[in-house]
Amino acid sequence: MAEALGAQELYEKMFEQRFTANDKEYQEYLKREQDQPPIVEDWKMGNQRNTDRYRDNRHHRGWDGRQNWSSNSYNQSYGRGGWGNSYNQYRQDRHNYQQGHYTHNPSNQRFHSDRY
């Protein structure tokens, strides 16, 4: 403990004039011209359209402006997904995938892969 106090006192003595008017190196640093910030050109990958993930892309929704494809009356009345609806198929495939490759461990509530 005494060595730690001695080291602390040593460093305080070494750096007591740091960043003051008596610190010649720091004063030279303050006198130098500031660096210009870097200029980054084409940071949005040039002229590629529809790459903004925050854009909602309304022009891809369909000819009649339906916003929720999985709950329209066409798909519900015929009971077979209809045109343009693969949501239930995706969920079924995903469910089978999770059952095939992952097991649930109730002791720590995490999924463990049997692939490794």
From Swiss-Prot:
It is found in: Nucleus. Regulatory subunit of the mRNA-capping methyltransferase RNMT:RAMAC complex that methylates the N7 position of the added guanosine to the 5'-cap structure of mRNAs. Promotes the recruitment of the methyl donor, S-adenosyl-L-methionine, to RNMT. Regulates RNMT expression by a post-transcriptional stabilizing mechanism. Binds RNA. Keywords: mRNA capping, mRNA processing, Nucleus, RNA-binding. Residues 31-116 are annotated as: Disordered. One of its GO terms (cellular component) is mRNA cap methyltransferase RNMT:RAMAC complex. It comes from Xenopus tropicalis. GO terms for molecular function: enzyme activator activity; RNA binding. The keyword Repeat does not apply. Residues 1-55 are annotated as: Interaction with RNMT. Pfam families: RAM (PF15320). This is RNA guanine-N7 methyltransferase activating subunit.
